[in-house]
Amino acid sequence: MTTERSSEISSPYAAQPAATSAAAPATTSESKPFDLDTVKKVRTVHLAQAKATGQKFSMLTCYDALTAQIFDRAGIDMLLVGDSAANVVLGYESTLTITLDEMIPLVAAVSRGASRAMVVADLPFGSYEQSPQQAVASAVRLMKEGGAHAVKIEADASMAEWVRALVRTGIPVVAHVGFTPQSEHALGGFRVQGRGDASERVREDAVALAEAGAFCVLMEMVTTQTAQLVDEAVGAVPTIGIGASNATTGQVLVWQDMMGVRTGRVPRFVKQFAQVGQVMEDAARAYREQVRSGEFPAAEHTF
């Protein structure tokens, strides 16, 4: 599979030019340039347009309605209800533990809270690997019961048929390549992917899944060179990076990481934009102290 061939991949979700009418007036007013910030409801076509016009888009993980509302107001374009909920919401040590039944209520909560952002739901470990039919059944539940707009699947070239089956069913797919956390044991732990000759394998995976119909390719923990190769190879299909440099169309982070809620060591690719965890701890401590001292509730808080 050559780069020349794969670079011609077009997104099936890209906007199609309007048909020309013979009765149309000779002169028409020029349409306004596409601006993702003006979109009232983000859809797959808008992400394809973003790549076509050189605009970047943002994605954050999200697991509840109130946080979805906050991120919506901030203009975040996509919300990922990730299997990372296993760690940051449910307290499991591994993302492998979370089940489809545990994911669906989280997806539904985010869907109820979001009005502009596209909601993407992870297919958790054990919910799709057996067959394309199992993947479709699980994805249908995430969309029907959870209200997701799309699903994300960790896959390689051998699972192109899974993507085709989902797309045939009418389910938009984000294909996750590079480091895939659900395969952490097979990959030898949390390790950067795509070094040296391995970059070609990541590229081949991405191209195969894009050709199968994925509307977006997410790359995790890959080298800058690999990210550049993949973004070019998949053509019009947008790319999302997490630890994949700024060569991608969009970026995603776990919100508890980028806002400093989780304590301890954070991955190298995380930038902490705030220390929300410390603010919460300080507020909780102040509340406890005022309750113990009798300062709260004061007269203005009583009837």
Predicted ranges, named:
Residues T2-T53, F57-F303:
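Alpha/beta enzyme core
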